[in-house]
């Protein structure tokens, strides 16, 4: 199972997270937090949220340092 990035339309932090992941060559699927009631309940105030196998790896402001630590880049 790969990475899943929970995002929201118009979210600048989500756009930054997506760009950072792409720059590091990390492929992920995207899910809109507002399109799923369960995701909305869990993550509405936490986006962007990076998941792997259902586990939260990062949320909020993504930085290269935080990403590197979590993914051992």
Predicted regions and their residues:
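A short, hydrophobic beta-strand/beta-hairpin element that forms part of a small beta-sheet core
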Residues: 47-56
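Surface-exposed interaction regions that form or flank ligand-binding interfaces
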Residues: 43
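Non-catalytic, surface beta->alpha helical segment in thiol-disulfide oxidoreductase systems
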Residues: 55-73
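Thiol-based oxidoreductase modules, predominantly thioredoxin-like and allied folds used
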Residues: 27-37
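Small/polar loops that bind or transfer phosphate-bearing groups
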Residues: 6, 31, 59
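Local sequence-structure signature of Cys/Sec-based thiol-disulfide redox active-site neighborhoods
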Residues: 1-24
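Short conserved loop adjoining the S-adenosyl-L-methionine
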Residues: 40
